[in-house]
């Protein structure tokens, strides 16, 4: 079966977009997602995004990481979907329904309300998620938040100085996090401005992570480090994050189409 795809990215976090809203595709498996995402033998991406019909929203977005695992949310992919769809829409995800819309220079996404209770992260046992009483070497007392998917956020003096490539895997897979965890290292760079590096669950180091930017901004706001509108700069660029009066997280930032093509599904199944 010959299948069309669109390659897109949000601040360098890149996606293979597959649209099954009008015409069904074969079932997506972990093996197929891994094969498509492979940068040497496949098309190559951080996530495979599958758009499907939905009974509860305008359509459904499914997200498969490069390791083949299906995850709940992806902020950068949500902006890419907004650009691809071309108009405002409510989108069903495994993490809940989000609202997307094209915006000047990219897209705007209402990521919904963050969750802070330890069961929602989830953690293996009860802890204060504003400051977990745990540490990994020089990294201590992170905040934890679920913004559709689970994150821990460490605030340090210099985010660039932390060897996240070596520390990330151990934190991601720590038994404290039964569903694994996304790891964020952040430092304040000015009034309502943060620098961020992210080890993404199932992906590794990434140039940008939209949900990571949301989680980090919310953690900074909860700790009184910033106001309720924050600029978060990642290696791939900057996102604007707002925690609005209704406690919804609003993310605004760029997305772009890279190219389009086709592939034979059988080659990747």
Curated annotation (Swiss-Prot):
Q: Does the keyword Secreted apply?
A: no
Any idea of its EC number?
A: 5.1.1.7
Where is the site labelled Could be important to modulate the pK values of the two catalytic cysteine residues? Answer: 151, 200
- Per UniProt, the enzyme's principal EC class comes to isomerase
**Per the UniProt entry, what species is this protein from, by scientific name?**
Erythrobacter litoralis (strain HTCC2594)
Q: Which family does it belong to?
A: Belongs to the diaminopimelate epimerase family.
Which terms does the UniProt entry file under GO BP?
Answer: lysine biosynthetic process via diaminopimelate
**What is the role of this chain?**
Catalyzes the stereoinversion of LL-2,6-diaminopimelate (L,L-DAP) to meso-diaminopimelate (meso-DAP), a precursor of L-lysine and an essential component of the bacterial peptidoglycan.
Reaction it catalyzes? (2S,6S)-2,6-diaminopimelate = meso-2,6-diaminopimelate
A Gene Ontology molecular-function term? diaminopimelate epimerase activity
Keywords from the UniProt entry: Amino-acid biosynthesis, Cytoplasm, Isomerase, Lysine biosynthesis
What pathway does this protein act in? Amino-acid biosynthesis; L-lysine biosynthesis via DAP pathway; DL-2,6-diaminopimelate from LL-2,6-diaminopimelate: step 1/1
- Record's Gene Ontology CC terms? cytosol
Main localization (coarse): cytoplasm
The protein's superkingdom reads Bacteria
**Which residues catalyse the reaction?**
74, 209
- One Pfam family name is DAP_epimerase
Keyword Electron transport (UniProt): no
* Subcellular location field: Cytoplasm
- Per UniProt, substrate binds at 13, 47, 65, 75-76, 149, 182, 200-201, 210-211
Q: Give the quaternary structure.
A: Homodimer.
User: PANTHER family this protein is in?
Assistant: DIAMINOPIMELATE EPIMERASE (PTHR31689:SF0), DIAMINOPIMELATE EPIMERASE, CHLOROPLASTIC (PTHR31689)
- Its recorded name reads Diaminopimelate epimerase
């Amino acid at each position: 079966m010959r299948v069309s795809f669109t390659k897109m990215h949000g601040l360098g976090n890149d996606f293979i977009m597959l649209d099954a809203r009008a015409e069904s595709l074969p079932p997506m498996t972990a093996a197929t997602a891994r094969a498509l995402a492979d940068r040497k033998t496949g098309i190559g991406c951080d996530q495979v995004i599958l758009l499907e019909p939905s009974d509860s929203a305008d359509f459904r977005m499914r997200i498969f990481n490069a390791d083949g695992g299906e995850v709940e949310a992806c902020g950068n992919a949500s902006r890419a979907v907004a650009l691809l769809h071309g108009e405002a829409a409510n989108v069903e995800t495994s993490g809940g329904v989000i609202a997307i819309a094209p915006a000047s220079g990219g897209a705007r996404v209402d990521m919904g309300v963050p969750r802070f209770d330890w069961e929602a992260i989830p953690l293996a046992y009860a802890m204060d998620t504003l400051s977990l009483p745990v540490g990994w070497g020089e990294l201590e007392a992170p905040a934890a938040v679920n913004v559709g998917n689970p994150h821990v956020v460490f605030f340090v003096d210099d985010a660039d100085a932390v060897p996240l490539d070596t520390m990330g895997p151990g934190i991601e897979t720590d038994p404290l996090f039964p569903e694994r965890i996304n790891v964020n290292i952040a430092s304040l760079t000015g009034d309502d401005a943060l620098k961020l590096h992210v080890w993404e669950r199932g992906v590794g180091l990434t140039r940008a992570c939209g949900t990571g930017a949301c989680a980090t901004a919310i953690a900074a706001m909860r700790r009184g480090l910033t106001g309720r509108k924050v600029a978060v700069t990642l290696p791939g660029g900057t996102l604007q994050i707002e925690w609005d009066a209704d406690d919804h997280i609003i993310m605004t930032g760029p997305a772009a189409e890279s190219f389009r093509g086709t592939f034979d599904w059988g080659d990747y199944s």
